[in-house]
Amino acid sequence: MRSSTAAVQRPAAGDPEPRRPAGWAARRSLPRTARRGGRGGAVAYPSAGPPPRGPGAPPRGPRSPPCASDCFGSNGHGASRPGSRRLLGVCGPPRPFVVVLLALAPAATPARACPPGVRASPPRSGVSSSARPAPGCPRPACEPVYGPLTMSLKPQPQPPAPATGRKPGGGLLSSPGAAPASAAVTSASVVPAPAAPVASSSAAAGGGRPGLGRGRNSSKGLPQPTISFDGIYANVRMVHILTSVVGSKCEVQVKNGGIYEGVFKTYSPKCDLVLDAAHEKSTESSSGPKREEIMESVLFKCSDFVVVQFKDTDSSYARRDAFTDSALSAKVNGEHKEKDLEPWDAGELTASEELELENDVSNGWDPNDMFRYNEENYGVVSTYDSSLSSYTVPLERDNSEEFLKREARANQLAEEIESSAQYKARVALENDDRSEEEKYTAVQRNCSDREGHGPNTRDNKYIPPGQRNREVLSWGSGRQSSPRMGQPGPGSMPSRAASHTSDFNPNAGSDQRVVNGGVPWPSPCPSHSSRPPSRYQSGPNSLPPRAATHTRPPSRPPSRPSRPPSHPSAHGSPAPVSTMPKRMSSEGPPRMSPKAQRHPRNHRVSAGRGSMSSGLEFVSHNPPSEAAAPPVARTSPAGGTWSSVVSGVPRLSPKTHRPRSPRQSSIGNSPSGPVLASPQAGIIPAEAVSMPVPAASPTPASPASNRALTPSIEAKDSRLQDQRQNSPAGSKENVKASETSPSFSKADNKGMSPVVSEHRKQIDDLKKFKNDFRLQPSSTSESMDQLLSKNREGEKSRDLIKDKTEASAKDSFIDSSSSSSNCTSGSSKTNSPSISPSMLSNAEHKRGPEVTSQGVQTSSPACKQEKDDREEKKDTTEQVRKSTLNPNAKEFNPRSFSQPKPSTTPTSPRPQAQPSPSMVGHQQPAPVYTQPVCFAPNMMYPVPVSPGVQPLYPIPMTPMPVNQAKTYRAGKVPNMPQQRQDQHHQSTMMHPASAAGPPIVATPPAYSTQYVAYSPQQFPNQPLVQHVPHYQSQHPHVYSPVIQGNARMMAPPAHAQPGLVSSSAAQFGAHEQTHAMYACPKLPYNKETSPSFYFAISTGSLAQQYAHPNAALHPHTPHPQPSATPTGQQQSQHGGSHPAPSPVQHHQHQAAQALHLASPQQQSAIYHAGLAPTPPSMTPASNTQSPQSSFPAAQQTVFTIHPSHVQPAYTTPPHMAHVPQAHVQSGMVPSHPTAHAPMMLMTTQPPGPKAALAQSALQPIPVSTTAHFPYMTHPSVQAHHQQQL
């Protein structure tokens, strides 16, 4: 093994002297290859310099004894590079062992190579001490040992100091302090004679020579002139190796031959080693060491050990695997393989017994077994006492008096503790099974919170605050109406409008109410429903109220008291529209009419408590209504008859409407101011103005009656409003009245606290009624008749019309429901001789007073027609009263609405809704959720309406929803005002109506007349128009018909009247409103419509009627229905496809309604659809698509309630019914949303004034005229849709 010898001899040419300082300098200037070699000398290495490559490379020349330098250099990888034999060898291929053999030789021994081929073995301890060099002195170089990674140092004769003349090398065992004379095994050590190979030590191989103060570059060539290491620390390669094996198992063989095993801990510059847990290894026993033999730590001096062996080391670990945490930790901590899991076989165990941890308190080992085991194996006896007598005092039960006293005292203390709030809170926390999300999320996903809007798709939907009002309108109009019942009391529509406006403010129940009515609603309003007003206002919350319509009314009544002012405004506008007689609607400015309606709504709030109460329950409604009849009934008939019927509060709402009506044109142009003030001022003013209102009083008295009578009353109010509106003075008066109304409404609101309880009671009754009604439609009709009778009786006190209405309702319960709509439609459409005469007459009769009290009936849009209708209604006042259930039947008054047209700006679609008196709609919105009163959500609610009113076409109601969508944003009352001035009701609530109302008026000039009734609805539903696009887009085709019809019907007081869409249950409300509004007095389809309409009215139609004052307006003129068809009706009818002929659409609606029987509002929409299609008048319409088209005579019913608007309202899926309805209607559902609005728009052939549809992009359809109105065409629907948007 002379590879090292050859390597060492390379520098032979160089004198030892060159190793001196001069030599160092020269060395520094050597080529890098030479320097890398680590060998000293001033001359470059000879050509033979490069050591053999590879661990097993045969040495050049004769083999010399192994030396450490060769071990590191030639054995290592670095051997491949010149001069890198030493340390690089350590980094070479992995070796199983690293053995350091220290051959101790006398320091003075001249350097001599071991005989060739002879491998020097380390001397035993028996070696004479003279042969052992002093520790730390340079050791002779050894030649590499090939094979396993072992390092051995064999004694090498050191040349005398003078001979070597080299700087002591940093050999493996050499130290910088070694005498220069000692020829260190440094890589630089050079032997003078070639025969005397100087093997560089492993330390030298490291390239770190003691003399190299700067520190060797080693193979990196990074000079470190300022750093110097002592001893072996200067040998970088050796340091690397020794450091890498720290912590490894190490065997040290000492000079005496003993072998010690331990864990290598550290080393010193002098190569002293420290082993932890060291013990002497005996070859005899293979067993491990004994504890007493293990020494914690042992230091082996460099002079004491011969060989150091590290077992199981991997010197190439740094070059093999990736340096990832997992890879490194796997090496250090062992292999972490996935454990093989084995299936556990429980055997005979049963999970209920042995495996139940809760029942096993032994922690897996029975204490007795443990004690026994310890005793048997260790003789330890346990003193454990299961009674724990050492820690507790056992209670000795006895019957002594003292013990019993103490026991009683203990029980008392325990009860006190357990009943404390702290304890309960702590226990609740411990036992709370809710997840973190349920506890802290802002999104409430509890379906029960939604009060039975189960069918609605938004059960578990998070509705952003910005959209909650619309959603509430769509599917929570009833509910919202309920909370706002106080405000919308007079009619679902007003209530709904208020609701929607409120819903728009749904974020803060009271805030919304404040916005709507200018007066915050009291929390009671939501009390009826499980969720708070804000909840009602919120979209999702609104939905449940819809489902829980019955409960809603009570909630509304409470809310009405708190929010009467605002609600009256918001509701008032819609309710008056539907409530106002045609004549009023036509006469009064349409816009004013909506305002008037809003004010009546305020009144409604004040009197609505009775109304609401009765609305909640027909019976209940009747008494409260009667109690509050003078004040409430007056307003209720005007704007909230429907509402009162549906929600009980409607009456109040009508009152509010009436104040509005006065404002618009209370009873007359001159009375408008007083009437408005009166209703707003509160019940007293309502009474003052309500001399006519009492006629409507019966309507509030009983939900059914309210429905039947309300339409007539609303019709009257509509007429009055229309008259007022028609006359500039009346309009101004109405406006003023409306303005003043808010304050009065507020006052009423405040005074409504008693109403809250009544409302609640009514809600309960309504719920019962709803359930009964669903189960027994016929009985429901009867109950409605009874309720209507009661209402009529209430009204009887004021007017004989009530009796007629009662008879009318009893005559046709299906008609009654249909009548409701028809009433709305009829009263709206007084111009329609066949239906309007009796119905409108009654409505007018009623409305006349109502208008006085409500002053502003939303029928102002149909002012002109309403005027005519009004006169007509005067003749048939009794009949109209009989159809009190159809406050929406109030004259369609689209023309009246044409005046409000200026406010139409906000929403073009609105105009469609406007035509309908919205009075009915107003009344309806509150009932939307109160719907149970009027009709079970799924049951058809027969609306006792005068036979003339019966022909109300459900389709007309549908259009209303168009506005509903916008109205839903009632919360954004400001938007509503845009739609119409009347919406400016003194209360915030007016805003929604205003927003909805003006657009209705402005959009369809002809429509206005036609939509006069609707205009009021739009007031409350003003958002309807605005929201319609929203809702329509949401569920345009699917929900619009059903939702609109039903929702409106259910929640006419809330938003149906002013703007179905605006209402919380805008979706439903709008449609329902539309239906109600559409319920045209058209006799041709009266019967056919009646049955189908019955359903529509029962569930949707009535709701729509109230929801859509327009419906009332429409009734006022049979042809207005075409007007409605152009925009509103078509949509209403379309249910899902407004292109289909109204009959088809109506049929679809019927089917949808059937589908939605569970969902009253939706159902109503469907039914109304079914009714609408049948009417021949509608069929004659040029546009088959447009439902309105189907109903030429009932066109008024259509009263250009933009179906698209309605649909948008329904678009929000407040009720399951929406979807079914849409589907039922036809595959057109999709088209509905987009094309609805324009289709809804219908050119008013007869009425030119309403032609100014510009606002709604709808052709105004004269409500008064009977002529069919050409539909704008579906393109107009698009326009209408835009309008909604």
Curated annotation (Swiss-Prot):
Residues 1-85, 111-178, 197-224, 428-925, 1111-1191 are annotated as: Disordered. It comes from the Eukaryota. Residues 128-144, 526-552, 685-694, 814-838, 896-907, 1128-1165 have a biased composition (Low complexity). The modification Phosphothreonine is found at residue 710. Residues 428-440, 447-461, 757-773, 790-813, 864-881 have a biased composition (Basic and acidic residues). Residues 29-38, 596-606 have a biased composition (Basic residues). Belongs to the ataxin-2 family. This is Ataxin-2.
